[in-house]
């Protein structure tokens, strides 16, 4: 009975996560395809959104199948330190790029509300691509910092799950610092956006009186 329950859960998780991954790949791929196809849609904010979609696309296309291989299906050949470090690095990279991209969109929203036409005349597609480059650079640095302590001494044929757990444990002192920094920045930006919106509302109300 326990074996049947375990098999059922494995199949359920496999099908469910595969469906989510397929949905994410198709959805984000559609966003990227539309922005790439129509030149008039290649605007400053849309380029930032496209980069967010790209990070999500890679996360679903690469990291989800990898997770299914080592954690759900538990294939015997997916073992060793090298595969563990590569999979953890890719997961960290795409996750951090995703978070940084969302922060960049918050910054874009704040500047658009705060500076109006001055900001609209300043931002260009060329600057958007530079910001995208910075986002990937920041994501890469954060991923490297998280995976710095990869010097784990385990058996050669240890599973990827075991290696990743050991590497993650060694990176725990760094992870909370990085995550806390992102959370603080997001909260501050959200507060600044809210304050700017309230200020604009007061200005509009003043002119209408």
Located regions from the model:
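Intracellular signaling interfaces of 7-transmembrane GPCRs
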Residues: 37-47, 109-131, 191-209
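Extracellular TM2-ECL1-early TM3 structural module of rhodopsin-like
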Residues: 6-14, 18, 45-105, 112, ...
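Loop architecture of class A 7-transmembrane GPCRs
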Residues: 1-2, 74-92, 120-122, 140-185
């Amino acid at each position: 009975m326990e074996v049947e329950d375990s098999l059922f859960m494995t199949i359920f998780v496999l099908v469910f996560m595969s469906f989510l991954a397929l949905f994410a790949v198709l959805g984000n791929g559609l966003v990227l395809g539309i922005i790439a196809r129509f030149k008039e849609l290649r605007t400053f904010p849309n380029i930032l959104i496209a980069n967010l979609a790209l990070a999500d696309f890679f996360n679903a296309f690469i990291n989800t199948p990898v997770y299914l291989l080592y954690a759900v299906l538990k294939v015997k050949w997916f073992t060793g330190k090298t595969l563990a470090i590569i999979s953890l690095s890719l997961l960290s990279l795409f996750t951090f790029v995703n978070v940084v991209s969302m922060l960049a969109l918050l910054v874009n929203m704040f500047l658009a509300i705060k500076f109006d036409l001055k900001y609209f005349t300043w931002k260009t597609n060329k600057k958007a691509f530079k910001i995208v480059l910075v986002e990937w650079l920041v994501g890469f640095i954060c991923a490297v910092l998280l995976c710095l302590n990869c010097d784990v001494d385990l058996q050669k044929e240890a599973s990827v799950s075991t290696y990743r757990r050991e590497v993650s444990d060694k990176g725990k002192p760094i992870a909370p610092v990085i995550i806390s920094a992102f959370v603080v920045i997001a909260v501050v930006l959200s507060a600044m956006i809210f304050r700017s919106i309230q200020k604009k509302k007061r200005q509009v109300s003043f002119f209408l009186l």
